[in-house]
UniProtKB/Swiss-Prot annotation:
Comp. bias intervals (Basic and acidic residues): 176-189, 206-220, 522-532, 567-581
Quaternary structure and partners: Interacts with alpha-tubulin. Interacts with CPNE4. Interacts with CEP290.
Identification of the protein by name: Centrosomal protein of 162 kDa
Subcellular location, principal: cytoplasm
Coiled coil (UniProt feature): 610-1120, 1170-1205, 1234-1385
The species this protein was found in: Rattus norvegicus (Rat)
Bias type Acidic residues, positions: 192-204
Function summary: Required to promote assembly of the transition zone in primary cilia. Acts by specifically recognizing and binding the axonemal microtubule. Localizes to the distal ends of centrioles before ciliogenesis and directly binds to axonemal microtubule, thereby promoting and restricting transition zone formation specifically at the cilia base. Required to mediate CEP290 association with microtubules.
GO cellular component: axonemal microtubule; centriolar satellite; centriole; centrosome; ciliary basal body; cytosol; Golgi apparatus; nucleoplasm
Amino acid sequence: MAHYSKVDLDEEFERFMKELSDDSFENSNETPSQPNKDRKKKDTAPWWIAEDGFEDDGLLGTNVSYLKTKKTYQPITDMEEENEKVQFLKSSGTSVLSVDSLEANELVASELHHSTLGLGLDTLEEQEEKEQFFARLEKGLTSSIDYSKLNQELDSDDSAQFRVLHRYQGNVEPAEGGRENESEHKELPETYSDDFEDAEDTDEPLITKDEETRPKENPESGKGSFPNQEEEKTGMLANVVLLDSFDSVEDVDLNNHERPTPKAKALPEMAGGELAETGVSYGQSSGDTEALHQAYHHVAHSLGDTGEPRIEASPGHSVRSSAKDGLQENEESSKNISTTESDLPTVEELMKPIRIDSYGIRGFDLQPVSLQKAVGSKEAESVSSLPLTVNTNTMSQDTRHVSPFPHEQDESVVLHRTAGEGVGSSCPATEEHLDKMYLEILRKKTSVNPSLLPQDNKANQTSRSRLSAREEAPVTSKQVPCKKARSAPPLPRRKPQSGLYASARSSGYSKPSSPLQFFSALEKKTSKDNTKTKNVRPIPTSNQFRKREILSGTKLIKPAALNKPSPHREGSPATPKRPEDPSDDSFVQLQTETLGSYGGNREKELLMLKRAQDAEEKWRGAQALIEQIKMTFSEKEKELENTVESLKRQQERELFKLNQENYILQAKLSSFEETSRKQRWLQFGETSDPLTEEKLKQIQKEIQEQETLLQGYQQENERLYSQVKDLQEQNKKNEERMFKENQNLFSELASLKEQMHKNHFLPQAVENIEPTKNQSFTDLLAELRAAQKEKNHLMEDIKRLKQDKQALEVDLERVKRERDQAKDQIAYTTGEKLYEIKILEETHKQEVSRLQKRLQWYAENQELLDKDAARLREANEETERLKLEIEKLKTESGSPANQQRLRSKERALDAKRIQDLERQVKEMEGILKRRYPNSLPALILAASAAGDSVDRNTVDFMERRIKKLEADLEGKDEEAKKSLRTMEQQFQKMKIQYEQRLEEQEQMLAHRQREAPQNQHNSSSRLKALETELGGIKEAHQITVRKLEAEIDVLKHQNAHLEHKKNDKEDQDLQSIEFQVEQAQARAKLARLNEELAAKGREIQDLTKTVERLQKERRMMLSRQSPRGREEMAAKRLKKEILHPNSGNANAFSETLGAKLYHPHTFTDSHISEVLEENYRLRSELEGLTLEREKLKMESEAAVCQLESSMKRVKDDAAAHIASLKAAHEREIEKLLCQNAVENSSSRVAELNRKIATQEVLLKHFQGQVNELQGKQESLSLSQVREEILQKQITKLLEELKEAKENHTPEMKHFMGLERKIKQMEMRHKQREQELQQIIQQTRQVVETEQNKEVEKWKRLAQLKNRELDKFRTELDSILDVLRELHRQGVVVPVALADEESTAKEF
């Protein structure tokens, strides 16, 4: 919907005040219509978008017309029926739209012409249209209704009644109704929306004015049936507050509210001298007086029946009662009583200060952020700052209607109850009964859901304070509203209503009421009001505040149309009370008297006019205060904006907490439901809960809808993306086409220039042409002149361009100079930076090398530690294993005495056996020597056996010894490395500590140097203190030195004693070591002897076997062969015996001697030639054997010599190793002594001496390293010089090679050029690829951001809709709770209510 800017609103407000002061009533009819025309042109948006029209600047727009509006008087009986019907429909979530309510200007003749007009076609058509409309509602076809067409049709239907009313009024304002009708139609382009989601804006923290006017209608319609409660009990249900979230369209002006409500319009009264219309001036024109006369005639006729229901049904009661209640509540408002006949605020009312006590309930204007959206800072200001003086009775209904939380309903119930006490006789006992019922229901709800009551305590406190104020009010003030209710006149002219369902017309048929009772009540009222409003002093408020009150005056006055007073709410806008001036009171009295006598007294009329002039002067005086109000407006506005922002943030935080708690509770509830469902299945085997199934179906349905929405968004995004691509392609094509066209145009331009050039310098052969061609000649001359002008222009351009060129050259030179300067500066800075970078690089390299060395050192240290740990682990394992073996041996063997006995016996047996074996060996050797004294194999065998055994045993022993010594040496080396490593660690630690100490000392020195000039003035006193302190320190130092010396002496004695003990231990250790060595040698000798014994036994067994075998062979040979054979066998045997000298032992010898067999052919004679051959053969064999023996002897001698040399070498090595081990052992002992001394001495002197010794050692080591490094540095410098020379030579050779290649052939040059071009092309290609990649990434990012924004927008929309659904469900739950409570208390519910409850449950 189109919006008015602030400037337009200010202009309209100025016009309105001008009209009030200048009596320009006719001109005022034209002014509001102009913006409406503009709005009608602008308002092309559909009805569902137009509902949120008031959200931009926070103001209510200018839909409020300041023209006179026509009013209709409706009978009460039809109102009650209509109210009940529409209220029940609204509570079920159905939007109720009557054909009557859709009209913008519904003008029906008043009760004066009720008899003349009769029932009329209009009423019958209304009934038919209502029936059709409700039938469509039941069928669910309300969304297809075109309400704008219905408005036009109904306006055309009502034109007849317009004419009737105008005729009856004497054509006082003929053009006014038409203008208003026109303006009203322009102001009401909106139609009702079925979608409650569009109607509610859940992020508004403050309730707007129009939002307040809507809820006020429902309770008042419900209270319209109170006069009939004694006869009908069903009228009580009108008190049930049913918040119709479908109709809660925010920021829509009053006429839009009037449309969807089918109730009769309540008529605010007009009494006294005040005019009912918003644009009427207070001048004394004849048209105004005639209109007043007609109004009082209507009053006289409409109040003919003055029964109690009639009085309560009159609209005057509501505003009067609201004024009286406002007097009882606020001390300041007691001076300003609003007259029931006018919606305009008085000057006193506009000047009222914004105070806390002028409001009703605190905290009610602060709605949570998630529920309603702030319309704007200005409207929030006006909403939170308006002084409200409307009755709390209807305020309680309004709060119940607006509030989405139970605590607000609790507030409203308490207020409703207090209001009921203030009303007095107009409030029957049934209302108190309903109040108690509401209190019980709301207590239960607040006890069940305490998380939804962040403002409960505050509201209850304020409501209790208001209740106590009500109870303390005097009884006379309570009775005033009932008296005033009898003097409520309906007016013939219609103006925007603030009562409940004020826009709906009813087709009732009530009788005109008598005017007599009205006059008596009116006189009483005016006489009382005169006494109360004499000493009213205007107080300045903000201009914006008063402007909003006047602009929204027709919308915000809610005098209860049906027996109910207007609501009084803190923070929500309502019509402020308007105090009556004495002139107004006298004007009322005068008017009533003139109406009583009707044309009787002329003087009263003159007095009335005089008082009207006085009122006009007061209004002009009030206009002067507007300037003062403007000054304070900006400050108030800023303060209110700040407060609104802080409240918004507070509400956002509270809402966030509530959402979190709600989410947790929902999760808990779902878990509880699942457990209860499982228990039910286990116990009864029932199926799942149908309610949860329905909820699941609803949730699935919502999820499907969301998915379809997302699919639609995705399709739309794809379509838009394809469109973007098409547009990009089209753009490229257009660029190519334009480029081609430009080229064509350039070519055409060149050709035209050439043609023009030719035309300029054509030969002057044209002179010889015939005179008929004079016209063409003149044309050519004109072209020539034009060309010359063009030429002149071009020459000027050339001059100008030359000048520009010179200027640009000057600038270019300047830029070049600047460039050269910048280059020089850059070179200078780069040189400095390069030098700094080099220094930093060198320092970095040094640091890196230092850290690498330290890292390497740590790595080596870790390796050593790992080795030590492995060795320690192995040693532990070995010790464990040995312990187990020892335990096993102990268990196997008995006591140590038995073991020693057994060992001694075994040793004795072994010794005897060894002696026996040695004796046998000696005997065998002696036998062999005796038998074969010169036998070479026996000698060699004896020598080899003896030598081998000795040699092998000694070699094994030496090898084992060498291995052991090597292992000890490696262990010593590792220990030495460890000690060196520990020394290095200590050195590094000391170095770090020394550096830290130096830094600390330097810092302290610098600090003291900085503090020195400051402390010079008190140096003398400090010096004395320091001297005394120094003396004390010296004494303490001497004492400590003495103590340390004593400790050193004691430690020296302890050290000597320990050294003595250490030496004793070392001697014992050395003796034990020698004993262990001797034991090891004895064991080795024993093992060697055992081995030799075993070898001798094996050799004896072999010899016995060979002897037996030879004997067998001999027997075989002797038995078979002849004497020749025997000789050969003897020779063979001799040979064998020579080869095996050991084969003859004692057993074999005894066998050869004693066991000879007899052979007869043994000693027979043989041939001499055979004997000679045998001798020759034996001699030759003997010579060979002798040669072989000599050879073996030489070899054995060489082996003996070699063995001796190796033994000497092994002995020398062993002696050297033993010497080194002794030296290492001594060093280790010294080290142990040093460690012991360090550990056992706590003296600082010994520690420092040790450190000094270590430092000296390290210094020597480092000096050696420095000397080595100096020598290496010299060689390094020489190598660097050599390397530089070689590098120069290499570069020179490469350049020569390159030049030779280039100058070699042209193909090579071409090849080199191609290589350069290829490199350039590759570089360009890479750059283009990078640019393309950047462009692609940018486009992707843009598309992704747009998609993300779109998705976030739709997500927010979905969240808003879900919150609105939750709100609506909570409202329905509260409504159903109220209805259930009514059922429980026995209230009879009609059929429509039951239908409504069933529909709500289905929802």
